[in-house]
Amino acid sequence: MLDAKRKWLLICLGLFISIFFLTVTNSPPAQKPPIKVGLLLPYTGTMPLQAKGVTDGVELYFDEIGRKAGGRPIQLFKEDTELNPTVGLTKVRRLVEDHNVNFIIGPVHSGVALAIHDYIRKQKVIQVNPTAFTRELTSPQKASENIFRVCETTDQSNFPMGMWIVKNTPHRNIVITGSDFAAGHHSVEAFKAGFEEAGGKVVKDVFPKMGTMDFAPFLTTIDVKGADAVYAWFAGTDAVRFDQQYEEFGLKKRLPLFGHNVITDDPYLASIGDAALGIITAGHYSYTLDTPENRAFVKAYQGKYGETPSRYSEFGYTAANVVGAVAEASKGEVEDIPRVAKEIKRVATKIETPAGPLAFDKYNQRITNIYVLKAEKMDGKLANVVIGKIEKVAQEDVWKWWNK
């Protein structure tokens, strides 16, 4: 009798164990924690359209991959730098210390990027800088294994543009002008170096403060004897006011206006209006670029947002692509920063962005095509139309004038 009971208990125990293991085996696996991505952008201030473009590009790419990479969901956190370096440092601390983000995409402003640089390089986080393009950030003196940049530097577009103007136009005596902060100075000074190396001469430089409302006093000083053109760097609403007042002042007819693409930025072209017509600029992207990758990007972007993408949209899209690609290649294991940093360089070479092939140099700076653009009417709408191309410009090719 006892043996029968014992057998019955053993049978029941065996059935229980079998049912338990079947249940465990057939249960869905526990979901992995999300990959956290922080957007550190100026949603308020004078550059909200830049922030919108980056954000829209990021969201489009992550939507295309189902908000998931490497088997982990992707979670976004947004912080407003207010275009203020002190605020930017506070907000990046919040992303890292409160939200524990794995990646940071941002900022836009070079001053903010420099303010957060030393903090970022000490953290277990990867920063993909979409827009801040002062040359310092990826210089040998400041480069860091966990900081990447997908926009061009101040040298990469402006230095070769100086050479392009000498080669392709009759202008040899130019006034340079830009906003009185790091990116403004570095941009027009890089242009000066390339222009003078090619045989041109800069006859004057003028640096209004960022946020200048009335450019008349500066336009008076720009109009100097012997000058035959002007090269400018102004961003956001500063560019709108400068371009409009430049034309109102009657300068454009006798002093053609050139510059970096910020002075005819796509998000601000409609506000600038016909004052933008004929301005020739250098930049890494235009939605008018005729490649299969860009046509697909423009179609998807228009389908989602009902408008054409700006260069900020491409920056954001490419930054998100870097994050998604490395997360996928790493099978979601993105916490080992040195390994992830090495993996980014490997996967980047397989990415064909809307602006062209992607690659990073040894300082984690993007090597990029630079396009010469002219503001024209296209289908009744102002657009930066591609009229020239400078291929695969690396920062090491164009920084010799200061990095000696």
Segments predicted by a language model, with ranges:
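Extracytosolic ligand-binding ectodomains
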Residues: 2-404
